[in-house]
A protein has these predicted regions:
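Extracellular carbohydrate recognition and processing domains
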Residues: 101-125
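Short solvent-exposed loop/turn micro-motifs enriched in small/polar/acidic residues
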Residues: 55-57, 85, 115-117, 149
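Disordered, acidic Ser/Thr/Pro-rich linker "stalks" and the adjacent N-terminal cap
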Residues: 1-65, 82-84, 157
Length: 159
């Protein structure tokens, strides 16, 4: 056993807000649709808020292609729906090139009378990824072709 006695550091820890990556600068994004009032930049920005919303109903895709291979230790997804009663499912995939592996899959039920916000934060160990993909099915209670719900994303953050 190697042991050292050290004095506590007076330096403050770096706030997590400063650790989130600047996705607008390091990635190119592909989306399946976009409401012009809620562009994807609003969900990926570290400064702008307002989130992204799909222009069409049913399942949607957000795919990030990174300029350089990336290591990711934390992933945060934030969804908000204050008006609809619905069950949503999302899945995150990541990898290099066409080889993507599922990282997480999660379902959530929104209700205007209570459950209006979902924030999921995951500790991951991804290295050398060039692509991150988010698939959102905004309404698990219907056949995707019959869904009347619009997918939305308040924010996506990586550290």
């Amino acid at each position: 056993m190697r042991k050292s006695i050290v004095s506590p550091s007076n330096a403050a820890a770096t706030p997590i807000g400063e650790l989130w990556r600047d996705l607008e600068r390091i990635a190119r994004v592909e989306i399946s649709s976009e409401d012009e009032s809620f562009p994807i930049e609003h969900a990926l920005s570290r400064t702008v808020t307002g989130g992204w919303k799909a222009a069409t109903t049913g399942p949607q895709l957000i795919r990030l292609h990174f300029d350089e291979p990336l290591a990711v230790k934390r992933l945060q997804l934030h969804f908000v729906d204050k008006t609809s009663e619905r069950s949503q499912e999302f899945a995150v995939f990541a990898g290099a090139g066409a080889e993507l592996k599922e990282i997480v899959r999660q379902q959530w039920s929104f209700s205007p009378q209570g459950s209006t916000e979902e924030i999921e934060e995951y500790t991951v160990n991804l290295s050398g990824i060039t692509t991150l993909e988010l698939k959102i099915d905004p309404d698990r209670s219907h056949d995707p072709k019959q869904s009347q719900s619009y997918a939305s994303l308040q924010s996506l953050k990586l550290a």
